[in-house]
Amino acid sequence: MLFSLGNTLGDYSTLLRDILGGIAFVLYLPLLTAFVKSFKNYRLALKNLLTASIFPTLLMQGMLMIVYQDVFPEWYGFTEGIFRTIWWLSFIALISYIVIFSKRFLWNFELSNVFPSWAVLYIGIGISSLTVPWTGYSQLGKTIFIYLLLALIVLLPTIFLRLWKHGIPDDVKSNLATLCAPALVAVAYLNAFETIYRPLLLGLIILSQMLYLTVLYFAPGILKSLFNPGFSALTFLLIVTAIALKGAVNYFEGLYFLYVIELVLAILILIRVVAGYINYFTD
């Protein structure tokens, strides 16, 4: 999620944007290389329901790279072509993955198999709408947004029903962070449409903020627990929620102070998670 955070902070510092983008590439490329080299091992790991539902974040990062297509203006034609190709490959792979996951886990549906991270899986495709300002695929972004609304209506009640009936194990409580996924729907709406219907935007913002507060309630306990790669879900959704507020400020100016607070919190938690990743891989 460093790609998105770097782009957001680019409004305040171009240098900071480039630094975060560079760190994101340094972290992303080895991860992608490891996935390709150890595909068989990862394929076995993806048979785990929880791991499988979080995996799409790797593809979402591939789509987010396109926000850095202008990092070298003198090579724009080349970098734009590279990043657009990566965007399409990630987009197609994400749709294919959703189909495969659905066939595997929805065919014989069990409520106990549903985790909050299903929101990332099925709503994560909203990255295609978020990146419309860079891709120019406005019609695709609008179509995806309609899907996101429908997915949100089906997913949230299902997820909360699962949590109410079955709870969630302590060792995977970091998965609760993915409850912030509706914020991505708000960002998708803001980026894909020229005309914004304020009541709809306000409804999405209120919903995302309610879930954000829920995640913050559990965040201290999550961060105190033993680090695992699932912590990335925490940073991803907290940053998206802050980005949603940033866009909403153009329509509801009173949200600016709240946006700054959430951005700072997202940065602090990101630092904690990056440190955890460094220790995780060095050990």
Residue ranges and their predicted role:
Residues 37, 72, 102-106, 152-153, ...:
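Short loop/beta submotifs within extracellular cysteine-rich repeat domains
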Residues 16-29, 79-95, 139-153, 198-210, ...:
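Structural signature of hydrophobic alpha-helical transmembrane segments
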Residues 114, 118-164:
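Loop-centered beta-sheet repeat module
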